[in-house]
Amino acid sequence: MRGVVSGVRDYGNRMGIPTVNGAVYFDERYTGNPLVYCGTVGLIQKKHVEKAAKKGDLVVVAGGRTGRDGIHGATFSSGELDEKSEMVSSGAVQIGNAIEEKRLLDVQLAARDRGLYNAVTDCGAGGLSSAVGEMGETLGAEIELDKVPLKYQGLSYTEIWISEAQERMVFAVSPEKIKDFLAVFAAEDVEATVIGRFTGTGRLALLYGGRQVADLDMKFLHGGMPRVVRQAKLDRPVFRDFTVPAKDTYTADLLRVLAMPNVASKEWIVRQYDHEVQGGTILKPLVGPGRAGPGDAAVLAPLPASRRGVAVGCGCAPKFGDLDPYWMAASAIDEALRNVVAVGADPERTALLDNFSWGNTDKPDRLGALVRAAEACRDFALAFGAPFISGKDSLNNEYTAGGKNICIPHTLLISAMGIVPELIRATTSDAKSPGDAVFIVGVTADELGGSHYAELLDARGGTVPRVDKKLAPQIFKKLHGAILAGLTRACHDLCEGGLATAAAEMCIGGELGMELDAAKAPLLARSSMEDARVLFSESNTRFLVEVAPDKIARFEKWMAGMPFARLGTVTGGPDLVIRGNGGKEIVRAPWQDLKKAWQGTFKGW
């Protein structure tokens, strides 16, 4: 864990790219296959979007040199692991150099602005084989592998071709511009070398030492493999509810939920990452006067002169996948969207990305679960009008040790990016001022299945949270309008730990108390529910919203027709007080105690 954090820190900070949003999820089934997701978003002028290599263009590799590190990296990451993997596959791990990457990035942008290349791609999975193969798909290419700059001698032409060594880009440069292109790179001391050309023959020809070592038809290379057919087994889960013990108070339970690794503060990670570099981060990972409360999403201002910004958030709910992968995927999408909506993003101008990490899809039950999750992505992208613009997958995440096979949980990370129309309306989650009203928006259902409270009780089964395809987009749109109209002072989505945890996090961030009546929360198809289920259900599409007294009437009028209720007020005292059925006090704790529990889990890491 520390190695992952230091890797992201050292590379990201040195690149001068702010690390502004993230999440951490623990499950013992990740022990053999720990997952790390890193993503970057950038701004590009429209005139630079369309890029394509042309017949006669030269193939140029620039940046770091090629070595044996990263050989079969994609193959390694796509296969099942065992006790010997660390020793026999260590060469599959690339060795990064952030300074080299930063120099390459800067000079690439300079060359772009001067119009010195026609196309560019990175050397990712498969190295030069994928980069050149993809760029030359419709043209064909001839590559002289002995011209590729090497870190050291002794590499075979196969190793040169498939090495995934980092910090390398491949460019298509017209012969008329190659002199200027190479001069720009040389001026910044970034190595750039012509290794071939795009031919127009439709074939991929590889040369080494004066002889041809490969000759493939591009159509065969890209479309020659027959479509793979596998068997999928679609299990329809049967939900069996569990009993929740009735208690006089749930304060201790709330403190325990706040301390759970998947809920607790990740400040020890956040503080190591530079989220201020470039000076465009408006909303940061931690919010409130003491910068201790959790932010729902980051808001960036990439164009200093513009009133508009970009919100970046994410959603991930692996525990739900144990019960139903379809609703796990739907919940991840809903979470990512409500995170960006909570900070002021327009849900109708939001795009999604998916990252699937799964077990061995040769096994029918694993593939069946993947099919169900993919169906949910389709269904809810259409329901929300939010397109998937990119994505990635990593399959076969299974580990065999001592004769026991361990498969990771079905894992889908959804990232959301949305336009914030008015940066001045960007909203944080911390409670702001005593006397303000606190509203809940959305419907609470009896959905403790896969929840953190269920984990606390060591309870299996229950009903997994679902998403209402018709109602959820309406709630997002209405709430966004209220935020844009300046009717809200704080907004926080209800997620891990449910209503009680969200209220606690707002109190921690604002260093204020609250008095809430949980029994007033809108419920699904019933007039009352056990206190514990109202407090800790992780139903989707819900928010806690703080509204100033002089805007309560306007907010209520604006949200008319949506499920919402006024639960209580922000108080100047330290205590979070929550009342349940019959007006009985079921939670009381000062924000200092809540903060201590929330921050204590990883204190000293």
Report each predicted region and the residues it spans.
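Glycine/proline-enriched, intrinsically flexible loops and inter-domain linkers
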Residues: 1-605
